[in-house]
Amino acid sequence: GVPSVSTVNVAQKQHDVNFLLFKVYI
């Protein structure tokens, strides 16, 4: 099915957090 907008927003925020953590670790 198609994910709801809220689900997409949460996933995007989690991705942003993971990206920031990745930059910190490098």
Curated annotation (Swiss-Prot):
Q: So which domain of life are we looking at?
A: Eukaryota
GO MF: oxygen carrier activity
Q: In which tissues is it expressed?
A: Hemolymph.
Does the record carry Transport as a key word? yes
- Subcellular localization(s) per the UniProt record: Secreted, Extracellular space
Any Gene Ontology CC annotation: extracellular region
- Keywords associated with the record: Copper, Oxygen transport, Secreted, Transport
Q: What's its job? A: Hemocyanins are copper-containing oxygen carriers occurring freely dissolved in the hemolymph of many mollusks and arthropods.
Q: Which family does it belong to?
A: Belongs to the tyrosinase family. Hemocyanin subfamily.
| Entry protein name | Hemocyanin subunit 3
The organism named in the record is Homarus americanus
